[in-house]
Amino acid sequence: MRKSQRRTISGRTAVITGAASGIGRALAQRLSAHSCPVAIADIDEKGLKETEASLHAPTLLRVLDVADAEAQRDFAAEVRDWAPRPLGAVFNNAGVATSSSVLDAVPEDDDWLWNINFHGVVNGTRAFLPILVEQDEGAIVNTSSVFGLVGMPNQSAYCSAKFAVRGFTDSLRQELRGTGVTAINVHPGGINTNIVRNARWRKDPEGRGRTQDQMVQEFAAITLTQPDKAAEIIHRGVEQGKARILVGPDAYLFDTLGRLAPTRYYDLLGQLESVLRRRSRASAAAEMTVS
């Protein structure tokens, strides 16, 4: 078995898209604290400036639509000229969400998601890869998702884009064999970020009449991992030379169920959810009795 190639990115320049909030902001903060000059990009200028204000290392800020291939190439050229140290890693992290059944899906929403979640990753990879290849070291780190491991209802656009990121990154990694450059897939589970708040919702995909604010609250209640912990896991995984980084206990659960029961994992998840709900109700009832 081929051993993982350990690498050090601390102290080297890092590029991070989707850095205005969530995992991207947490990565910028963590890597900045590990002496990395950071080039941060996002379409949200206000959030990006808030991230910049929290950093303690040389920073390059760029308002960027990752779906714009030419803008990505311009950003890469700017980073090449600016970077005070060799490039250690490029984190193609920007992402958005939608939710609807296949029949209710709005094509414009699906295109919007795909242009950011998949083509944004491709654009960033193609823009920065020549720099890494030239220096013969570094990592392309692409954010897929736990939904790039298993398919889920009402998430056909999101799942398909994240599966595409996974396949693209795995293929690229094979192309880079024998070089000092690698490509890494990141599969976050439920992370407490703004992705649901910023998603495009037309109506409750489950037909329960929930508002977007209610769905945001439900998502926050089930997230198991905070962004700073996700950033720690990703940073450590890159330096350990992992080809795939699972973020959060739910990511490991989905990965395991997808491997063991590739056609029945959703049924098993439903059974597990029922058990957890019963335990939660029983625990709440016991607390009321004691009080």
Language-model features, listed with the residues they occupy:
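Canonical Rossmann dinucleotide-binding motif of NAD(H)/NADP(H)-dependent dehydrogenases/reductases
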Residues: 4-38
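The beta1-alpha1 cofactor-binding region of Rossmann-like NAD(H)/NADP(H)-dependent oxidoreductases
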Residues: 45-46, 63-74, 107
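Substrate-binding pocket helix/loop in short-chain dehydrogenase/reductase
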Residues: 101-102, 106-114
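Active-site loop immediately N-terminal to the catalytic Tyr-X3-Lys motif
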Residues: 103, 150-157
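Active-site helix of classical SDR
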Residues: 125, 161
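Residue(s) in the substrate-gating loop at a strand-loop-helix junction
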Residues: 145
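SDR active-site lid
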Residues: 178-249
